[in-house]
């Protein structure tokens, strides 16, 4: 069940000098209830060592934890789900067979529909607005509305979304919003997470 509206995506480099597990705990303190552990440079062993304490923390807060791309580690650690890129479309059924929730990254309607048919529980659609972290051109709100209208699963808007842009994304049909750099910044991320949640609550 997808019962969260803000999907926080990690980048441990941004929250230094704080350890990522401590930073995630601070995010959960604000009311965030879904984390995607996206540390793609780590080996399986390293990822597992990070995921285990974060999973314990998430369970203490009744929050969901998704691991990016790595079905094996997700299964071993016992997290709630995985988040898969378009290139791993063929592994959705493998993840579902292991009772994992599946989120997928999509950038166009055709792939989004294929992900839904394959069994994805939700998708992130990006980039809605121009952003340094996404090389693709911004797709805009009109395209977001089109994707939402074509799918039966929740769509999370991602890419260049500041808290002030949350209402127009939700108004365009997004189930929620996803954010990485804005919520992972050591200096401002926690306050930004609060601002996202406030906009969602007031919508």
Where does each model-flagged region fall?
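Conserved N-terminal beta1-alpha1 strand-loop-helix module at the mouth
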Residues: 1-89, 94-122, 146, 152-153, ...
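Active-site phosphate/pyrophosphate-handling residues
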Residues: 72, 142, 178
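Substrate-recognition "cap/lid" segment bordering the active-site pocket of phosphatases
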Residues: 134-140, 145-147
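Short, glycine/charged-rich "phosphate-handling" switch motifs in NTP-dependent
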Residues: 175
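A short acidic, helix-capping loop that chelates divalent metal ions and anchors anionic groups
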Residues: 74, 129-134
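Generic secondary-structure boundary signal with a strong preference for alpha-helix termini
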Residues: 138, 171-172
């Amino acid at each position: 069940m997808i019962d969260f509206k803000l999907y926080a995506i990690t980048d441990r480099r941004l929250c230094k000098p704080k350890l990522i597990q401590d930073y995630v705990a601070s995010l959960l303190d604000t009311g965030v209830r879904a984390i995607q552990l996206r540390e793609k440079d780590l080996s399986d062993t390293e990822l597992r060592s990070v995921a285990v304490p974060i999973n314990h923390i998430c369970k203490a807060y009744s929050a969901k934890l998704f691991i990016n791309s790595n079905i094996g580690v997700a299964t071993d650690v016992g997290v709630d789900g995985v988040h898969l890129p378009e290139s791993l479309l063929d592994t959705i059924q493998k993840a579902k067979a292991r009772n994992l929730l599946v989120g997928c990254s999509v950038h166009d309607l055709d792939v989004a529909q294929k992900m839904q048919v394959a069994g994805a529980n939700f998708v992130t659609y990006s980039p809605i607005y121009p952003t340094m972290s996404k090389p693709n051109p911004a797709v805009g709100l009109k395209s977001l509305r089109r994707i939402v209208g074509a799918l039966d699963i929740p769509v999370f808007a991602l890419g260049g979304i500041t808290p002030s842009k949350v209402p127009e994304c939700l108004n365009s049909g997004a189930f929620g919003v996803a954010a990485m750099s804005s919520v992972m910044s050591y200096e401002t991320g926690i306050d930004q997470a609060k601002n996202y949640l406030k906009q969602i609550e007031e919508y």
